[in-house]
A protein has these predicted regions:
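N-terminal secretory signal peptides that target proteins for export/translocation
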Residues: 1-7
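Immediate N-terminus of the mature polypeptide
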Residues: 3, 27-28, 48, 225, ...
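Short, Lys/Arg-rich amphipathic segments at extreme N-termini
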Residues: 18-19, 42-46, 470
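Outer-membrane beta-barrel proteins and related beta-barrel translocases across Gram-negative bacteria
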Residues: 104-106, 111-113, 121-142, 146-166, ...
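An N-terminal low-complexity intrinsically disordered segment enriched in acidic/polar residues
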Residues: 5, 19-23
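N-terminal amphipathic/hydrophobic interface segments
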Residues: 25-146, 165-168, 172-173, 178-180, ...
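Bacterial N-terminal signal peptides
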Residues: 10-20
């Protein structure tokens, strides 16, 4: 009779409750015997001594009471003493999949209590427990002189000493609390004791989460000194939990990092507060930060959401490796979705941490911003109609403030011709009105779209812009008998729109980070936000090509914007200068799952130079991998500042069966200087991972000097799914050097 069940990590001692009545049975009898509970008893021989009320089952005994299974060579049931004795290769199969073994088992007290000698158990995928003896008193199981290890042992290969083991003079498993306690616990590495604790505890496999200490970690840094992280996990309920993590350093003060998570049926929330006493510009002070995100349902159609990122100190995040962001964005919103309409009201707050940052009073607060969209279900003139109404109030303590109201209507009609041409006709109209209040004391802090200062006083500006678009695409598709597919698709978009549309006096609030690239070359309106309008007749032309074959693919794109007359709003470095834009290209080659190569090029038709060059390579070769990225931007876009060039590489090298090495580097090619480097070496097998990593940051951020860090990582594995997701080295060497993985 074959029986299988899923296993979970943890310790479980199982007592089989049987009530046997009956008479003599022949070999291989299968007899359902019952008094209060029906069970199945199978054995080679079953005898019943009616004078002493004793049942003896011998030879391949199997007892199944639908809750657990007992296997043994011999089972004796003394009904008067209410005692069950099992001998010879005793196996106890628990409902959760764990299996216990013993040489001898005695069960008493209505089979609730008992004793096991020569106790062993299989736990989860690979865990093993060995004890000289074990006893059970109700829900509490006590094992003496016990040892636990998840490591595979093999006498044939000579691996008889586990890589690591947890030994204890006494192990107590309280099934009512779902927790396992180890008394006088000693952790051994390769048979050598390395850690002692009077008591250790962890939850049993049936518990999804339970409060307790997570794996600590440590390291040393030239900026922080020696540091240690001591995370503690708090299980609030099935949908809420929290983590408190003290970070203790010898040179830069101490902080406490927290995390709170809660999941709803249709949403969730996350908060990460950080607070500590640390130095800044030569003075010690209390510093803090808060990150978070959430979406909280408050009805059938309404949600409240937020994104939080704020700090009290300019260098706090960088000093403790909390975040490398230098611009922090916060928003709070109220959203409703009903049918085919959506309403969104939000507010935004920004914080600038950059070196040479502007005064925080000059950074705007957006409150409120309103966005309403309606798409009727019925077709309008055969096409789809869309109405969008938005408004925004932008407030500054210093500098000009403004309010905007915009209404946009769009009609779209897609068509497919008999020969496969894809034609989409659309018409669009947008009207905007601004109320701008200039700051007479600071007239030049905010400029309009032409770069002119916003004058003092109250000004009203309006504009209306219609647009007609014809989008044409004709995909040519062919397939071969070898399993190859080819797609060639020419694209042409004709846009008819009047010139102008960007009058003076409109503050450039949300169109400063425009970038022409392969993601928007075939967009009829490339401008982000509502401040800047791409006006005038133009054509977006180009082609896409794709080839698919067994094991890989090749994709390519080329596109350009053509105009009969230059738009003066776009300068030399915009990519849209003159009557011909940059020629935007992209290709991607994939040989799955081994190699992926992507390159993006923007060619300047006026100078013949390359304005943008991006290359991304990923290769996987067994246990080794290589990632390289290169970017060069010669265009001085507003959001990017001066031209820059950078190369970033990361190599993971598998060496033999257990060893691996890691190296990563990032270099500023524009200024010929290194930014970050990291080197690491690690060893791991089926139950333990060890690594040491060296990190060097070459950049200075105010009083946070370039630093060198050494990180130590010890990852005990317990045979659970979490082990598969625990990296031996940090996933991102340069943004989260202190990232940790918790003990499952």
């Amino acid at each position: 009779m074959a029986r299988t069940s899923a296993r979970r990590a943890g310790t479980s001692l199982v007592v089989v409750l049987v009530a046997l009545l009956g008479g003599k049975a022949d070999a291989q009898d299968s007899a359902p015997l019952s008094r209060s509970t029906t069970i199945l008893l199978k054995a080679d021989r079953i005898t019943y001594d009616s004078a002493h009320d004793v049942v003896v089952a011998e030879g391949h005994v199997e007892i199944d009471d639908k809750a657990q299974i007992l296997l043994a060579q011999k089972v004796i049931y003394d009904e008067k003493a209410n005692r069950v004795t099992a001998k010879g290769q005793v196996s106890l199969l628990a409902p959760n999949g764990n299996v216990a073994f013993a040489d001898h088992v005695v069960l008493t007290n209505n089979l609730r209590d008992g004793a096991l000698s020569g106790f062993r158990a299989l736990i989860g995928r690979s865990g093993r427990v060995v004890a000289s003896s074990a006893t059970k008193r109700g829900p509490v199981v006590v094992a003496r002189n016990a040892a636990y290890t998840p490591c595979t042992l093999c006498v044939r290969t000579g691996r008889t000493t586990p890589t690591w083991a947890l030994k204890a003079s006494k192990v107590v498993y309280d099934q009512s609390e779902h927790r396992i306690y180890y008394h006088n616990a000693v952790i051994e590495l390769w048979g050598v004791p390395v850690f002692y604790s009077p008591i250790l505890a962890h939850p049993d496999p049936s518990v999804k989460h339970l409060s307790g200490l997570l794996r600590p970690s440590a390291g040393t840094s030239s900026s922080l000194g020696s540091f240690v992280l001591l995370p503690y996990y708090i299980a609030i309920n099935d949908s809420q939990d929290a983590t408190i993590e003290p970070v203790i350093t010898s040179a830069s003060g101490d902080i406490v990092r927290g995390e709170y998570r809660q999941r709803f049926n249709n949403g969730g929330m996350w908060l990460q507060p950080d607070v500590g006493y640390a130095p800044s510009n030569g003075r010690w002070s209390w510093q803090s930060a808060l990150f978070g995100a959430g979406q909280i349902p408050i009805g059938d159609i309404w949600d409240v959401g937020y994104n939080a990122a704020i700090t009290s100190n300019q260098t706090f995040l960088k000093r403790f490796n909390i975040s490398n962001d230098v611009t922090l964005n916060n928003d709070l919103y109220l959203e409703a979705i009903s049918g085919r309409s959506r309403f969104l009201m939000s507010g935004f707050y920004f914080q600038d941490l950059r070196v040479g940052r502007v005064n925080q009073n000059e950074i705007p607060i957006v409150l409120p911003a309103i966005d309403y969209t309606y798409i009727p279900r019925e077709a309008v003139a055969g096409g789809q109609f869309r109405l969008n109404v938005t408004s925004a109030s932008i407030l500054r303590n210093v500098g000009a403030s403004d309010e905007r109201l915009s209404t946009q209507m769009r009609w779209q009609l897609p068509m497919i011709t008999a020969d496969g041409q894809l034609i989409t006709l659309s018409a669009e109209a947008r009207a905007d009105v601004w109320r701008v209040v200039g700051d007479p004391a600071n007239p030049g802090l905010v400029t309009d779209l032409q770069g002119n200062p916003i004058p003092a006083g109250v000004h009203y500006i309006d504009r209306a812009q219609p647009m007609l678009v014809a989008d044409w695409r004709w995909p040519f598709i062919t397939q071969t008998s070898a399993g190859h597919s080819y797609v060639l698709q020419p694209i042409a978009q004709l846009i008819a729109a009047p010139y102008g549309g960007n009058p003076s006096g409109i503050p450039n609030e949300d169109s400063t980070d425009f970038e022409l690239d392969d993601t928007d070359i075939f967009s009829v309106s490339r401008m982000p936000g509502y401040s800047l309008w791409e006006s005038g007749p133009r054509a977006n032309v180009g082609m896409e090509a794709e080839a698919y074959f067994p094991g890989g693919s090749i994709e390519g794109l080329v596109g350009q914007v053509l105009r009969p007359k230059a738009d003066p709003i776009f300068g030399v470095n915009s990519g849209l200068y003159g009557t011909r834009s940059d020629i935007v290209t992209r290709y991607r080659i994939r040989f799955m799952p081994y190699v992926s190569l992507t390159q993006r090029l923007d060619l300047n038709p006026h100078s013949g130079t390359v304005d943008r060059d991006e290359v991304y390579f990923h290769g996987t070769f067994g246990r080794s991998s290589l990632d390289v990225s290169y970017i060069r931007l010669d265009r001085q876009a507003v959001s990017l500042g001066a031209p820059r060039a950078e190369i970033n590489g990361a190599l993971t090298l598998g060496i033999g069966k257990h060893w691996s090495a890691f190296a990563a580097a990032r270099r500023d090619l524009q200024n010929s200087q290194m930014l970050d480097t990291e080197l690491g070496i690690g060893w791991q097998n089926d139950c333990l991972g060890l690594s040491i990593a060296y990190q060097r940051s070459y950049t200075r951020f105010l009083d946070v000097a370039p630093s060198t860090s050494i990180l130590f990582n010890i990852i005990p594995k317990f045979g659970g799914e979490a082990d598969q997701n625990t990296p031996l080295f940090p996933r991102n060497a340069f943004s989260e050097p202190m990232q940790q993985a918790a003990i499952p």
